[in-house]
């Protein structure tokens, strides 16, 4: 979570600090809790030194995330802080956390963060509070106060909560419940609110965004949602977490026809081999991987493709892994993230036989990343000499250099564009979007300079 205080008005009650861990969906929950407490008159800060009580919104997706959450909790407890533990770790281990951390004054589940003010008031009255619904059912909307903690120009917009799928390796349905979609009108209303705050990029998030609306309307409605959001005056709309089978012709047509939807597809494919996918409880996917990617590239020639993969899944053989290597070599993704399998208690995969040695899994991860790096470099180099819009996010007043992102880079997970002033010294402030001619590229990042009017006139005359 970004440093510094995030108060919107003079508080009338004590200051509460926040520590945020985990994914963008967790971040939105944090922002709602911040907004609710600020509305109730509490001061809110991201610096734990400002407060005696710290709300820690935790992650429990994989073992590394759990350990980071626990380290954060223990560190704050050793500083003498009183803790309100929220989020996925709280949903997962509520009783154990209350027993093992005396400084934990309250536990708040993933479907209960809207009660944060009541919880804090009960803590202040001397209670120890367990506010965890056994089955999360809540999903926030545009009426729930929210105070953003991200860069001024970027906002995550949660379109649904929970997940109806049961992938063998994933614990998310146990932590966040079944899918609950928001109405299209609610999402569009919040989008307008965010635009009024100066947001230039909306990132649509849920567990499976291509399944948006299935529970609410009886069929997926992502295409209709994108077309409705196309009426919102915002430069970029980005979609995260697209399940392969949900990329229907209607959805791809919306990508192609709605001008402010960027052609960036985040596809968590996980693997390529049919036997591994069957063990992951994703048996249908092997039939669509290559065909789907061909369709995307046919309909969206400038599409930027990101995927995430899992290696070391129980039973993964060297043959399975080589199949995945060949798939990656053939498909030439722009961006790839690779994870080694982490067995999660309560998931089907945790009970599977034939575990892969951790050293073998790590070696496979390293091999995939080594294969992908020159592909990513080549994909980036294909953008050299193009002029693209760049959203400026940082500016160094000493050097004049700026850092931003073009549409091919999502925040935090992808690269950056390092921007030099234009030939006449043109600069841009954070939160603004400017044309930049790309002059260089490496594995992860691009570099370029701002294009001024003189450059644009010269380019047009050269093309005439």
From Swiss-Prot:
Enzyme class label: transferase
Alphabetic keyword roster: 4Fe-4S, Cytoplasm, Iron, Iron-sulfur, Metal-binding, S-adenosyl-L-methionine, Transferase
Domain MTTase N-terminal: 14-125
Transmembrane segments: none
Domain TRAM as annotated: residue spans: 381-452
GO MF: 4 iron, 4 sulfur cluster binding; aspartic acid methylthiotransferase activity; metal ion binding; protein methylthiotransferase activity
Cofactor requirements of the protein: [4Fe-4S] cluster
CC cofactor note: Binds 2 [4Fe-4S] clusters. One cluster is coordinated with 3 cysteines and an exchangeable S-adenosyl-L-methionine.
Entry's EC annotation: 2.8.4.4
Listed Pfam families: Radical_SAM (PF04055), TRAM_2 (PF18693), UPF0004 (PF00919)
Binding, [4Fe-4S] cluster 1: 23, 59, 88
InterPro entries assigned to the protein according to its UniProt record, in alphabetical order: Elp3/MiaA/NifB-like_rSAM, Methylthiotransferase, Methylthiotransferase_CS, Methylthiotransferase_N, Methylthiotransferase_N_sf, NA-bd_OB-fold, Ribosomal_uS12_MeSTrfase_RimO, rSAM
Example GO biological process: tRNA modification
Domain of life of the organism encoding this protein: Bacteria
Annotated positions binding [4Fe-4S] cluster 2: 163, 167, 170
Subcellular location: Cytoplasm
Physiological role: Catalyzes the methylthiolation of an aspartic acid residue of ribosomal protein uS12.
Stated family: Belongs to the methylthiotransferase family. RimO subfamily.
Name assigned to this protein: Ribosomal protein uS12 methylthiotransferase RimO
Organism: Parasynechococcus marenigrum (strain WH8102)
């Amino acid at each position: 979570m970004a440093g510094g205080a995030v108060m919107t008005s003079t508080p009338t009650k004590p200051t509460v600090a926040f520590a945020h861990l985990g994914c963008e969906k967790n971040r939105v929950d944090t922002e709602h809790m911040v907004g609710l407490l600020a509305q109730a008159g509490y001061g809110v800060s991201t610096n734990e030194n400002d407060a005696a009580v710290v709300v820690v919104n935790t992650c429990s997706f994989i073992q590394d995330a759990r350990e980071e959450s626990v380290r954060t909790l223990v560190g704050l407890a050793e500083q003498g802080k009183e803790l309100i533990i929220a989020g996925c770790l709280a949903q997962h281990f509520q009783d154990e956390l209350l027993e093992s951390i005396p400084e934990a004054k309250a536990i708040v589940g993933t479907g209960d963060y809207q009660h944060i003010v009541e919880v804090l008031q009960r803590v202040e009255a001397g209670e120890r509070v367990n506010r965890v619904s056994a089955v999360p059912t809540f999903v926030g909307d545009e009426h729930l106060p929210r105070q953003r903690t991200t860069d001024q120009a970027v906002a995550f917009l949660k379109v649904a909560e929970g997940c109806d799928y049961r992938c063998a390796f994933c614990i998310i349905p146990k932590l966040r419940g079944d899918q609950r979609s928001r109405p299209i009108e609610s999402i569009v209303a919040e989008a307008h609110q965010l635009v009024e705050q100066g947001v230039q990029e909306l990132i649509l998030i849920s567990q499976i965004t291509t399944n948006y609306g299935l529970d609410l309307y009886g069929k997926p409605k992502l295409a209709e949602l994108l077309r409705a959001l196309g009426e919102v005056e915002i430069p970029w709309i980005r979609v995260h977490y697209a399940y392969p089978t949900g990329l229907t012709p209607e959805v791809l047509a919306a990508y192609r026809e709605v001008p402010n939807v960027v052609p960036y597809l985040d596809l968590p494919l996980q693997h390529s081999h049919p036997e591994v996918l069957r063990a992951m409880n994703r048996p249908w996917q092997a039939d669509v991987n290559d065909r789907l990617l061909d369709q995307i590239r046919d309909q969206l020639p400038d599409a930027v493709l990101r995927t995430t993969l899992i290696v070391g899944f129980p039973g993964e053989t060297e043959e399975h892994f080589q199949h995945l290597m060949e798939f990656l070599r053939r498909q030439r993704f722009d961006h790839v993230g690779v994870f080694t399998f982490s067995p999660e208690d309560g998931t089907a995969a945790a009970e599977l036989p034939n575990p892969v040695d951790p050293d073998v899994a790590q070696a496979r991860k390293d091999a995939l990343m080594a294969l992908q790096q020159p592909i990513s470099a080549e994909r980036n180099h294909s953008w050299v000499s193009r002029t693209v819009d760049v959203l400026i996010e940082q500016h160094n007043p000493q050097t004049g250099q700026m850092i931003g992102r073009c549409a091919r880079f999502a925040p935090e997970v992808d690269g950056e564009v390092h921007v030099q002033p234009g030939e006449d010294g043109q600069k841009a402030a954070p939160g603004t979007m400017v044309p930049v001619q790309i002059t260089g590229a490496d594995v992860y990042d691009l570099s370029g300079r701002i294009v001024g009017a003189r450059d644009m006139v010269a380019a047009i005359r050269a093309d005439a």
